[in-house]
Amino acid sequence: LAGPAAPPAPGFTGSPGVPRDTTTGHVPLPPGGPVTMPPPATGAPDVTSTTLAVLLIGPAGAGKTSVAKYWADHRRVPTAHISLDDVREWVRSGFADPQSGWNDNSEAQYRLARRTCGFSARNFLANGISCILDDAVFPDRPVVGLGGWKRHVGPGLLPVVLLPGLEIVLERNAERSGNRRLTDEEVARIHGRMAGWYGSGLPIIDNSQLDVPATARVLDEVLARSIASPPKW
């Protein structure tokens, strides 16, 4: 016999449940509304079992996708990982590769991918599944800035910046292949612009000397502080 249902995880609670349609066996899912901040914890928040929406920001080679995957894999509550680069590459024929130049077409596909990520994140959260997204969000370009993420996911999105040293991102970029590998000059340019996050009020993790598991642990610590005192952005 099945035991009693487990209590829901703390954090974002999503939409009220939708009654089951007993005539067809179809299982309706709650609609995904804007993600709000988790309610204040009575004590120290247990980030590993709290339903959250996280945005991991960083330059190419920062390790954000690897960290996001590891973090999602090792949580105590259901957690999804969405990489904007992966979603953008869903477009096969007609893919506007930003490496070929940033133009109206590549910007439109970026915006579409971001909106798709936001829609997915809201639906995951509405159904009790945490979500961590990763994207190279620039502090000095509103088009690819935080405003769009906040608009598409909701005010409860928790942004965190991964920013290792330049030599680290150059080494990691050299290990890449295909259209994910950039020139050293482009990597250095992106890394320099990402330094603009210093002084922004967002939490920043320098993972130059940290492996992926250690970075994920620091991410948990940063998120606990963000829940207790949300960053202004």
Label the model's feature ranges.
Residues V153-N173, I205:
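Conserved phosphate-donor/acceptor-positioning beta-strand/loop module used by diverse small-molecule
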Residues G178-V218, P230-W233:
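Small-molecule kinase domains that catalyze NTP-dependent phosphoryl transfer to phosphate-bearing small molecules
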Residues P59:
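P-loop (Walker A) phosphate-binding loop of NTP-binding proteins
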Residues L56:
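Hydrophobic anchor at the beta1->P-loop junction of P-loop NTPases
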Residues L1-T42:
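Long, basic/Gly/Ser/Thr-rich N-terminal segments
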Residues K64:
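Conserved lysine of the Walker
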Residues K69-L112:
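Conserved substrate/cofactor phosphate-moiety recognition/catalytic segment
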Residues A108-G154:
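Glycine-rich phosphate-binding loop used to anchor ATP phosphates in small-molecule kinases
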